[in-house]
Amino acid sequence: MSEPLRIAITKGRLLDDSIRMFQKAGASCSELLDPGRRLVLDVPELGLSAVLAKAPDVVTYVEQGVCALGIVGKDTLMEVGGSFYEVLDLGYGRCRFALAAPRGFSLSARRGTLRIASKYPNVTRSFFRSLGQDVTVIKIEGSVELAPVLGLADAIVDIVETGNTLKANGLEIVSEVAPVSARLIVNTAAMKLRKSEILELTEKCRGVLNA
Amino acid sequence: MTIFKAASPEGTRDKLFAECLRLRGIRSSLMELFSSRSYKEIMTPELEYYDLFVRAENPLPQETMFKLVDRSGRLLVMRPDCTAPIARLVASHFKDAEGPFRLCYDETVFRSAAGLDGADSELPQCGVELIGAPGLRGDIEIVSLAVDAVRSAGLRDFRLELGHADFFFGLTEELGLSREDEEALRACIESRSFALLDELVAGYSGEAAQCLRRLPYLFGGPEILDEAAALTSNPRALAAVERLRDIWRELVSAGRGDCISFDLGLVQGLDYYTGVIFRCWTPGAPSSVLAGGRYDRLLCDFGLELAGAGFAVYVGALASCFECPEPEAAKTLIFYESGCLAEAVALLGGGAELSCFATEAESLEYARRAGMKLLVVSKNGIKEVDPNV
């Protein structure tokens, strides 16, 4: 038996969903459910050893090859980019990127350069580039909905799940930007050097997800 | 000013003794190998005109290039790639010559790293270009030299992966894809985005579409070639598979087949490559340590009807796979009386260094502290002094 494949999993909701998927695939996930002080958590049934990380770090770990695999949201992949294989849409962690603005806002009615606030400046830039519209992007670290309320920006680009937060702040969705869900990513060299193990795992996950 | 005193620019760093030894060792064994195969070294300028790298086929985004402005206001870049300058060199110096020529280089390319991800902006590369050898023999020479290159650098556990541009182009041509869709599809296969690929191909039916859907999985041992050949009847794609098989057979008979694998989904930089494409992977390196292929159109851009093929070894990535011990400190100190410099210098090498002190007593004291033995060279000859007595 070769050494386990190291996988980086995004902490939080994606971790819970990932544990559920692994359990359906036949793993007990006892270490993942109760990490204690351990930093590296084994999932022996699937030949994995997991580390938990913040989403952008998952991408860094996989790109640099210290983890062969990673589970991370498409939102992060779109924002930070990088070079890796994106082999599986895991289907969970579903939400979407949307452009939202105070009621009555219309993209075509405004003249002059729009100011758009977002936690995701790269996603925002490439969305407006695809529309052929030049905008000023303002990076905000949290509570992006505040920006139009305070008059800092005309509209925001953010992750939307239910839309309740938007509504509570008098905002509505102007345009969908992109759907988001969790992805399984693979380091390029690992894919080549450990093909059979990785494909076996992706097939297992695919089987569970389609069940 | 002072805040930058201790820092080097993002993506660059100082390299000290052990790392230098390791890099130097790899570079010299590669260059020795290339020269033994009749590849002649060339050097192109570190600085080039920006325009050289903004031809349509160049896959390098402009923000990755370091730019400068010369006296007359023209835009220059720090060489971001070796092949385009070499194409320029061939086009301007070998206009009327007939191929083949064999060229090799040991240079640094500069690419502005995105920052804070540990990537280097200065990338040492050693590589070869075989110009004017369009056929199978040219492919075989380049691929087998690539195997020998990583071996000569000391790598034992590695995989050289072969693909062919025409497999992908044969299929997309059959589907009649627009340039844009073709690029979207290529990006999908490059990043193995299986889900998105299914979506893109969904509108098409038939053999070529089926085969494209399967393309990201078409990597592995020689059995992949049989699988690929069974999936398509497109003549261009089949010819690509046969070419790979021919290369592989020759390498196997030359004892270089064990490390060869195939990836027909190897579609990076396809704008550049027109035939065989290859990359070398090894455990311990997060990305490939060598990349190359055939680019028969590149020289045409420079007005020369000549085929080209070559590869570059990413020396930095390769070096990171090896441990290298720190160079040893000198064990012997040599103090010489005035007039005996020549005799003292003759004793250097093998871990000896000259004493910088003016007297034998000071030299002795230094040797004691540094744990060295002392040789005293005088007109009467050489005597060894044990500093601990």
Segments and roles (model prediction):
Chain B
Residues 67-78, 187-190, 378-389:
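Short, basic, helix/turn surface patches
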Residues 64-70, 176-199, 256:
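Acidic, His- and aromatic-enriched active-site or binding-groove loops in soluble protein domains
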Residues 152-160, 165-168, 181, 195:
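Extended alpha-helical scaffolds
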Residues 19-37, 48-49, 83-95, 103-155, ...:
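Positively charged, Gly/Ser-enriched RNA/tRNA-binding surfaces
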Residues 44-62, 163-173, 266-274, 362-365:
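Beta-rich nucleic-acid/ligand-interaction surfaces
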